[in-house]
Regions:
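C-terminal amphipathic alpha-helical segment
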Residues: 220-292
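Short coil/turn segments at secondary-structure boundaries
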Residues: 55-56, 265-269, 348
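Short polybasic amphipathic segments
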Residues: 51-55, 142, 315-321, 371
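Acidic, low-complexity/disordered tracts enriched in E/D and polar residues
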Residues: 259-337, 361, 373
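Long, charge-rich, low-complexity alpha-helical segments
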Residues: 12, 19, 324-373
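Active-site region of the double-stranded beta-helix
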Residues: 1-16, 28-177, 185-228, 232
Length: 373
């Protein structure tokens, strides 16, 4: 299924992106859910998939984590089932992500899907990421407050909420409506009837994650073996002092590593192309031979990217799931990064190069791409 999003992206980016929340009425016209509540419940029974149940009964919040064996104990009100990264595991839902590729691939995170019975929700809370919440089957009331300093508390160890807030948006969403919420705006949503919601999340790394990730890269590759030296050490009155020039030299030793262009780019491509959630990787059995890849493409078969696989480009270099893809065929690499579905035409003359075919076969045999159908 192909979803058509009615949205003026330049206007949205100027007026709303990371600035103000907005309701996009009928953002998807004639919206059809890509999966059923029963299918979502089935996914939450799988151990590889991150899921949780949140309920609010008799004034108490409860959270339980999947995999779940049964839902028979749940009542008919005040609970929600939430499943992360469904686009990694259920191919039809991945189509719901594609209209949002007007935004950078490296910023997109995953598709979280929730099923809620009347009164179901997770309470008032803050997120530190951008999210587009698409209303599927059913109706849900959403309230969004102003971005202010708010006290957060935990009514349950696995649930962080904020105090009640005054709403700047108070809307009932119907199928195809979209609510965009930037980071830091408090919000809460409660189902008015059995309802499906699809949350397209966009995350940004914080400074701690960047420093930690780069430090891991340095350690793995045994970089930074230059030792501090001070042949021009000045005398000092107090032996406990670290002099300003010594402090600056130590800091510059660290910055020199980060500022080395080749290392930084290699790390950044690997770091940003890694998925935060597990992928549904299923290498083909038996593995493809390069000539089989060639024949299949030439016969018109379509090569499809695995749901949730991050394929990013920095300059001329392409990275997939934390690995650099090496090939001199730049247009073919660009096609791998730009297109979800690929045909022989996308690869051009690269298919005539045995080394490129071998590389492509390795990617397919890793489970990163597969032939449609």
């Amino acid at each position: 299924m192909e979803y058509q999003l009615t949205l003026n992206w330049p206007d949205f980016l100027e007026r709303h992106w990371q600035k103000r929340p907005v309701v996009l009425k009928r953002g998807f016209s004639n919206f059809i859910d890509p999966l059923s509540p029963d299918e979502l419940a089935g996914l939450a029974m799988e151990s590889e998939i991150d899921s949780r149940l949140v309920s609010h009964q008799d004034g108490k919040w409860q959270v339980s984590h999947g995999p779940f064996e049964s839902y028979d104990h749940l009542g008919e009100s005040n609970w929600s089932l939430l499943v992360q990264a469904v686009n990694h595991w259920h191919e039809p839902t991945a189509a719901l992500m594609r209209p949002f590729r007007a935004l950078p691939d490296w910023r997109i995170d995953d598709l979280m899907i929730s099923f809620s019975v009347p009164g179901g929700g997770v309470g008032p809370h803050l997120d530190q990421y951008d999210v587009f919440i698409i209303q599927g089957t059913g109706r849900r009331r959403w309230r969004v407050g102003e971005k202010l300093q708010m006290r957060q508390h935990c009514p349950h160890p696995d649930l962080l909420q904020v105090d009640p807030f005054e709403a700047i948006i108070d809307e009932e969403l119907e199928p195809g409506d979209i609510l965009y919420i930037p980071p830091g705006f408090p919000h809460e949503g409660y189902a008015l009837e059995n309802a499906m919601n699809y949350s397209v999340g966009f995350r940004a790394p914080n400074s701690r994650e960047l420093i930690s990730g780069f430090a891991d890269y340095v350690l793995q590759r045994e970089l930074g073996n230059t030792y501090y030296s001070d042949p021009d050490m000045p005398s000092r009155k107090h032996p406990a002092d670290i002099l300003p020039q010594e402090r600056d030299k130590l800091r510059n030793m660290m910055l020199d590593l980060i500022n080395e262009p080749a290392h930084f780019q290699q790390w950044l491509g690997e770091f940003l192309s890694q998925s935060r959630h597990e992928l549904d990787i299923a290498p083909p059995e038996p593995p493809y031979q390069p000539d089989e890849i060639y024949d299949a493409l030439k016969q018109g078969e379509v090569l499809v990217r695995l749901g949730g696989l991050r394929v990013l480009r920095i300059g001329d270099e392409v990275y997939a799931n934390g690995e650099k893809i090496d090939s001199p065929h730049r247009p073919a690499l660009e096609a791998l990064a730009s297109h979800i579905a690929l045909t022989a035409e996308n690869f051009g003359d690269a298919l005539e190069d045995p080394s490129f075919l071998a590389m492509l076969a390795a990617l397919v045999n890793s489970g990163y791409w597969f032939f449609e159908g």
